Amino acid sequence: MPTLYVVATPIGNLGDMSPRAIATLQNVALIAAEDTRVTQKLLSAFDIHTPLTSCHEHNQRQKARQIVERMLAENIDVAVATDAGTPCISDPGCVLVAEAVAAGIEAVAVPGPTAMASALSVSGMEISEFTFFGFLPRQKNELKEKLLDMARRSKLAVVHESPHRVKDLLAAVAEVLPHTQVSASCDLTKKYEKTLRGVVGEVLRQTEENPKAEKGEYCLVFAWDERDIPAPAEAACPLSLEAQLFDGLMRGLTLRDAMAELLARGERKNAVYAASLRVKEKLA
């Protein structure tokens, strides 16, 4: 019976590539890669000549079936690798693993680097339990709601963030959960590696003052403070967009001005427009 190997690769420093990972990638018949161009550079660095096929976010369902069918038909072993770190952890790969397991193929881990574990290990925080949330919503109000939900569900949270959005994330945390302790690791194992630690407002300030703050991807660890977390009964129930538009009308605003007010708060344009249509229907 064939085997699917889930192979962790370096998150930046090639010295972290394990001998077992090298041997596995050399010995399988095919490597399913998130981006074949990125993985090809890694293979070239270790003189590995195994054929590659793409298996990424946009094609993984169709490709997973094709790969599994070929594994069974030709009785070949396959490895899955992403651009960096461990597949399936906020990265492609889980669809292929699920498809293989459903077909009776054994999935075997070849462990190695992962940004999440690396960031936790240098956080300086006590880690008895944590929750990994991957990437968070971009829209401001959705992000704030998600942060409060995370704080209620976990003592310690780990997230990924891009260098261009990390300041917005820290600012949102500082606004709704200001006593949060943060460990923000940037560009782990690479040239501009740096970890900032402290209360979220201080980490935000240091990030804003750091000219190299946008040089690499971030993995952040948040330790919430109970003082910031509203009890479920105390948590405010936000008004619907429709109700907020009616509130604006009651304050003497035109519907257009009430819509503009919501858009200025960061609400989504299509959602505000849909709410305005419902308001017009009720006023007709």
Residue spans for each PLM region:
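Conserved helicase motor
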Residues: 55-61, 136-137
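Short active-site oxyanion
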Residues: 25-31, 104-108, 156-157
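Glycine-rich, flexible N-terminal cofactor/catalytic loop recognition
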Residues: 1-58
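Glycine/small-residue-rich loop that forms an oxyanion/phosphate-binding "nest" at active or ligand-binding sites
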Residues: 64-114, 118
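Loop/turn-to-beta-strand initiation segments
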Residues: 3-4, 75-79, 155-156
